Amino acid sequence: MSVCYRPPGNETLLSWKGSRATGTAFLLLAALLGLPGNGFVVWSLAGWRPTAGRPLAATLVLHLALADGAVLLLTPLFVAFLSQEAWPLGQVGCKAVYYVCALSMYASVLLTGLLSLQRCLAVTRPFLAPRLRSPALARRLLLGVWLAALVLAVPAAVYRHLWGGRVCQLCHPSPVHAAAHLSLETLTAFVLPFGTVLGCYGVTLARLRGARWGSGRQGTRVGRLVSAIVLAFGLLWAPYHAVNLLQAVAALAPPEGPLARLGGAGQAARAGTTALAFFSSSVNPVLYVFTAGDLLPRAGPRFLTRLFEGSGEARGGSRSREGTMELRTTPKLKVMGQGRGNGDPGGGDGGKTEKDSQEW
């Protein structure tokens, strides 16, 4: 692509020293936290083969760690780019690296949306628990996620260009192309997935708070986890997509107007906001550690598998134990399981019933 639309001012990704410094710091911190964190998640879940089959949630978390880890492996390239103010690879490398980044971005947000939908169904439709454990369903969902990510990431490679042999950044043939590409990326990679996450967790929290144990310790723990996931997702991706929208509006504005000049500012700020989005790939393992609570000292390195074993979805045996947490959120079943030796499917231990619910 020989001719590129450029906003007034001719700013590039490297124009602002502050954005470069912020971006470098976020990238280094993301790699420091995210590479070992996601590696640990892959190590914990990849070889875990419970008798009843790996829970769908665990499979989604595994692929989320793979997607996040893949993009974090590219951080040395971006650190070199920002610190040396020159792209270390050529034109082909420019397109290929940003394609992998976009692929990881779409896979991560789609997997996050699926994970929130799975949790919502597990709470509101517990009778679907056997189907949610189906390996065939997991394979179909994952195939759909990765195929969709492969297709949605194509524009990131098409519109990347090496400017002056030094700067790898977006290159659109016209303002209309720029506005369409940036708006579509924000719609498919933020607005729709984030809306799904918010909707699913809103329904989940409403259902859990309606349960008798929803105001206790587990209600607080689940509420904090949900809030952390949604807050991290929104805060870390919002600046990147705000720049997208700013540049999309600026591209369609009159060339001499103030909005058009804001497009150049957005271009210069993109290095920092992109690095902040990278940081989102390192947050999930940290959230898993905080979610584990007292499982961490008791289960040690295997706390993650114990966390999913306690979710009820991983349990084998009788069908009455499928979706244990979800079924026991209803007031009626909660009363039935309060006493010892009363025929409770979990073995007649009321304390164990409460403990199982709290481990979800």
From Swiss-Prot:
Keyword Transport: no
Extracellular-facing ranges: 1-24, 82-96, 162-185, 246-275
Comp. bias regions, Gly residues: 338-350
Transmembrane annotation, as ranges: 25-45, 61-81, 97-117, 141-161, 186-206, 225-245, 276-296
Chief localization: membrane
Top-level taxon of origin: Eukaryota
Residue positions with a glycan: 10
One GO cellular component, as annotated: membrane
GO MF terms held by the record: leukotriene B4 receptor activity
Keyword Cell membrane belongs to the record: yes
Cytoplasmic membrane side: 46-60, 118-140, 207-224, 297-360
GO biological process: keratinocyte migration; signal transduction
Swiss-Prot/TrEMBL keywords: Cell membrane, G-protein coupled receptor, Glycoprotein, Membrane, Receptor, Transducer, Transmembrane, Transmembrane helix
Membrane topology: Multi-pass membrane protein
Localization per record: Cell membrane
Compositionally biased intervals (Basic and acidic residues): 351-360
SUPFAM superfamilies attached to this UniProt entry: Family A G protein-coupled receptor-like
Region (Disordered): 311-360
Gene3D superfamilies documented for this protein: Rhodopsin 7-helix transmembrane proteins
Record-stated family: Belongs to the G-protein coupled receptor 1 family.
UniProt function note: Low-affinity receptor for leukotrienes including leukotriene B4. Mediates chemotaxis of granulocytes and macrophages. The response is mediated via G-proteins that activate a phosphatidylinositol-calcium second messenger system.
Protein name as annotated: Leukotriene B4 receptor 2
Species in which this protein is naturally found: Mus musculus (Mouse)
Gene from which this protein is expressed: Ltb4r2
